[in-house]
Amino acid sequence: MKQLLDFLPLVIFFAVYKFFDIYIASGALIAATALQLVISYLLYKKLEKMHLITFVMVTVFGSLTLILHDDSFIKWKVTIVYALFAIALGVSQIMNKPLLKSMLGKELIVEDKIWARVTWYWVSFFVVCGLVNIYVAFSLSQETWVNFKVFGLTALTLINTVLTVVYLFKNMSEEDRKELK
């Protein structure tokens, strides 16, 4: 259920874009992200920081898109969110308080050097995706960008998540791996 909830705003944005335009889709994205927060709170009695950050970014950049009737803002939102994630991960690693380890370290027990590699891998991933988003958003058609945002970035993120889990699993002790099964 939680994973479906994570994709709700993206699905609504895409569907509304296909039937209307980027501006109505941006408004729908704002509403869907707000709805995501409400549903998440009702179901889990808490709000995740990532959802809150995303909501603020969607609201700010979506509103600018609507008010100024300029789709550049909603396109930049993707890159800025990725940059914030990269910065948060990088700073947490530099401060020896890796976010990924704090989120997953209880279930996936690996050495700190492995968490560092995974963290820097994700920092690099977010930076590259942010840069590619800029290229696609401002060099190709709006429809190509929407498809890239919805399908390309989502697929890349899912693939990288699977690769990360496999890498972490391979670097776990045999005993810890057995406990997961």
UniProtKB/Swiss-Prot annotation:
One of its GO terms (cellular component) is plasma membrane. InterPro entries: YciB (IPR006008). It is a multi-pass membrane protein. Keywords: Cell inner membrane, Cell membrane, Membrane, Transmembrane, Transmembrane helix. It is found in: Cell inner membrane. Pfam families: IspA. The chain crosses the membrane at residues 10-30, 50-70, 72-92, 118-138, 148-168. PANTHER family: INNER MEMBRANE-SPANNING PROTEIN YCIB (PTHR36917:SF1), INTRACELLULAR SEPTATION PROTEIN A-RELATED (PTHR36917). Plays a role in cell envelope biogenesis, maintenance of cell envelope integrity and membrane homeostasis. Belongs to the YciB family. This is Inner membrane-spanning protein YciB. It comes from Shewanella pealeana (strain ATCC 700345 / ANG-SQ1).
